[in-house]
Amino acid sequence: MKKLVIALGGNALQEAGKPATAQAQLEVVEKTSEYIADIVERGYEVIVAHGNGPQVGRIVIQNEVASASTPAMPFDVCGAMSQGMIGYHIQQGLSKVLRHRGINKNVVTIVTQVVVDKDDPKFKAPSKPIGPFYTEEEAKAIAEEKGYTMKEDAGRGWRRVVASPLPVEIV
């Protein structure tokens, strides 16, 4: 069986201009799953990889807001939470579409871990946009208040950026 890797960006998992709810993300994933199912029908074993910028950023914000009531999780745990959520939605959406087409295939999620070099220079130059978009004024206020690095993101607004070191190994 031929294998095909499909990469979905985190921004591709949400519809521009719509609320970033779990239900809205699931609806986008279900639409995307129609295309993935077409590929499965052509005889491919499909591996779906995905980004998580908007999702992990929102999870971090949720943790910050709730931190007065419950301890906030560290960033790596928030990343794993976003992987689990996105994988869960892909499992739900793709399984539903495959089932409706009479295709009996298992869909599984794997939460990955990577090893990075603690001396990677990218730790000193944050570049991965996460979370929602802000106006320039909002971004400056957030940077001042929280000490975050904020950058303009492709003409769409300003976002927090975090370090994105190169993986040395996948665990």
Model-flagged regions — what are they?
Residues 1-49, 59-64:
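N-terminal glycine-/serine-/threonine-rich phosphate-binding loop
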Residues 5, 10, 53, 72-74, ...:
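Generic secondary-structure boundary/loop-capping signal
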Residues 6-7, 48-50, 144, 152-154:
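Generic detector of intrinsically disordered, low-complexity, polar/charged segments
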Residues 12-14, 53-57, 115-118:
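Short, active-site-adjacent cap segments at secondary-structure transitions
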Residues 34-37, 50, 54, 58, ...:
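N-terminal, well-ordered alpha-helical segments
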Residues 47-54, 59-62, 134, 157-164:
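Aromatic-residue detector
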Residues 66-171:
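Ligand-binding beta-strand-loop-alpha-helix segment within the catalytic cores
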